[in-house]
UniProtKB/Swiss-Prot annotation:
It holds the Pfam family Ppx-GppA_III. This is Guanosine-5'-triphosphate,3'-diphosphate pyrophosphatase. It comes from Photorhabdus laumondii subsp. laumondii (strain DSM 15139 / CIP 105565 / TT01). Catalyzes the conversion of pppGpp to ppGpp. Guanosine pentaphosphate (pppGpp) is a cytoplasmic signaling molecule which together with ppGpp controls the 'stringent response', an adaptive process that allows bacteria to respond to amino acid starvation, resulting in the coordinated regulation of numerous cellular activities. Keywords: Hydrolase. Signal peptide: none annotated. Its EC number is 3.6.1.40.
Amino acid sequence: MLSSSSLYAAIDLGSNSFHMLVVREVSGSMQILARIKRKVRLAAGLDKNNRLSQQAMERGWQCLRIFSERLQDIPPSQIRVVATATLRIAENSDEFVGKASEILDCPVKVISGEDEARLIYQGVAHTTGGPEKRLVVDIGGASTELVTGNGAKASQLSSLSMGCVTWLEGYFNDRSLTEENFARAEAAAHETLKLIAPKLIEQGWQICVGASGTVQALQEIMIAQGMDELITLPKLQELKHKAIECGKLEELEIEGLTLERALVFPSGLAILIAIFQALNIESMILAGGALREGLVYGMLDLPIEPDIRTRTLRNIQRRFQLDVEQSQRVKQLAEHFLQQVAKPWELDSRCHELLQSACLIHEIGLSIDFHQAPSHAAYLINYLALPGYTPAQKKLLATLLKNQSGPIDLFSFNQQNALPLIQAQRLCRLLRLAIIFANRRRNDTLPALRLKVSDEALTITLPHGWLMQHPLRAESLQQEIQWQNHAQWSLVLGEQDAQT
């Protein structure tokens, strides 16, 4: 029986949507039990005097009546409910908050923009991998939070009065997707950003992380259209032109854009374009969590680990009882291969990290069965929660593990967008070879081999006589040559000349 003392809930009364996150604490980490979202569009109910309409408040209260059933099983001390931008500015927010507290039978706290920014940063820091020095961007319905920080500590907190709902009402209220409307929306966003942009740029960052529905929508579009996962200004401009071609909000159709997100997508896109331009952002990735995760981790009082991905991989190894020594052996061998070909094959630090990850969990499929273990591994990685990895990175890991041995499914590489196709395939080739050479599960049988590449032609040079001394692996390598050649990947095997 599930103990209620291990359950936690966080509710975010946003300007566009209300969200509820229910989790269970498991061995010092968070297991998600439910994510519930309702589109309330509270900000759209504000009049010129900043008073919420009765209809907007009723939409919100009805949503909370639905949420309240789930809260009955959770200790009140383990529930946090916060309200953000719209209820910060609404003149009659007390009326809404008072009734909301009665419905939920727990306090509702209207938090400041700075507190919201801090919680968003904490949620990102607990759930998103990559470099420690980061810029976090969250575009809400009525406010946008921009935060810089290093590790667990936020250094610059900003909350601006612009959001996808308020910009929709202000600059796309005629429902026309024109150059003029986008220009007005972007200009207004630039004006809002001009005071804080220099301060944020001064702080600097190594990675930019987006934590909003707009960024989630962009990821869904890019996956559907076969782009890689990095959000860049040229991609944003291209999507803007596609939106303008549609003419009207009601006719907005972009491959990968859901109907639910379509209404506020153009306004959120205009704000994001202005942010990229004002802050000179090169690229952005999707965050693993934000405000609600920040609230939950605050209740759990867990430290922020420097390397979230390492924690995730360690938990998987423990949960599925993987052979850690063998995983390390394969990883070290793959790294040795990577060092030899990284420059000509243009494999950067991002490739290095993802190859390491694949090596450390490559045997997870054995926890189901030896037969079709690579397919089992891909299935597990596709559906397990992997804090620190983006959805695109999860898909790449699943693709690598699916193709770690046996026939190569070239089509599957087109289904991932974490890396360019050619880089993903090159990582796969190195992983497959590392697994073959390490399959004796002993360090003293690993050869001192050399790799050389010319375009996609890969040549392996082994010590003289090694193939004759290791006939089973020699046979496996001959089979591997056939598999890779069948995929149009040239693989040549040779030995050093006998020393005289």
